[in-house]
């Protein structure tokens, strides 16, 4: 299994969170994975890169021109989904945003 497949398997371990990002178009990178999202916080490209010497990950959201919008370094494997979720989807008023977006009533 290459690193892109490994990262994807970690993300899929929390499939409902992954789907909430509007995850699509995964692309293998030399040392990671790039994909598109349509979250409440970020719509566009996310890159997850394995930092081999540290055995950690770097997560980046990118602007449309490819420049780095936000970067989180030294991300442990077991925190990967949570860190990406905080950069892409989860807002302080997440429950209300979901209800509003999908016109759900209590």
Question: Which residues fall in each region the model found?
Answer:
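General beta-strand recognition
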Residues: 34, 47, 56-58
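Negatively charged, low-complexity tracts enriched in Asp/Glu with abundant Ser/Thr
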Residues: 1-40
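A generic beta-sheet turn/junction motif
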Residues: 39-41, 52-54
